[in-house]
Amino acid sequence: ATDRHLWAETFDRDLSPETLFAVQSEIAAAISTALGRELVADSGQVAAPTTSNAAAYDLFLRARAQAGSRVDADIRRTIAVYRQAVAADPEFALAMGELGLELTNLYWFNTRAATDRDEARLWIDRALALQPEHPRLRYILARHLYHGRLDYEGALPELAVAEQGLPGS
């Protein structure tokens, strides 16, 4: 090992909403290389967000940070923020998918309302129509099939596809 500072590299770029994510990916890839790790299997690059809209991405990150609760009010707050992200960018496939996952969670853990389950599937299908091979979206579909439809056999092939593309699988 050397005493060279790993984080001394300068990233001098013009920042705009259009270039911000590319610079973030470049920095993360440099850190990954310095650590000798790959952040995404097969590509060696950080997975890019599926939006170039900074406001939508900020909302997405806020929702993602608060996701994971099984408490009805918490899930509903997360759903509301994902809805804002999708409203800010109606083509933001990953936000649509995560919205679908949270609606599935609302159904499974709390309401058992078919309207929540069915809306979840609509968002997941919209997301997959935009990015059919996105591994996180395939994982979300598997979770929906498993918890929302009790289609355990249908969930397995989706999990297999997701596993091939998700980091750490």
What are these regions (language model features)?
Residues 1-169:
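Acidic, proline/glycine-rich low-complexity intrinsically disordered segments
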